[in-house]
């Protein structure tokens, strides 16, 4: 996992899980809901970006290899959005692309953190809870 220097201090809020693998999406959502985190799911990049604009999530868990629009482009669209609050939405990339250059690209595009698959769902949830400011990281 890699983090950027930009951390946030905000109240817990809704997390948008963007993952085309239904099993992984459901596991992430189940694990977050167990921590009382509201979640929404998108299975492709176009839907994900539309939901970011509509729902204004507190954080986006974003797969990279997605149908219709890849995660890199979704992150680019979020970061270049004219609404500066929306453009600052924390993005945590989740990807099978785990080579150093892949992680570097994700971070350069504006990801706040990057988990390479296979990642521990427990670690992703703990990091999410830290980003949301709940102090429940490893509980």
Question: Where do the protein language model's features map onto the residues?
Answer:
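Conserved acidic carboxylate
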Residues: 19
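Non-catalytic signal-transmission and effector/linker regions of two-component phosphorelay proteins
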Residues: 1-16, 122-139
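Short hydrophobic/Thr-rich beta-strand motif most characteristic of the beta2 strand and flanking loop
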Residues: 36-43, 51-52
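Charged docking surfaces used in two-component/phosphorelay signaling
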Residues: 26-34
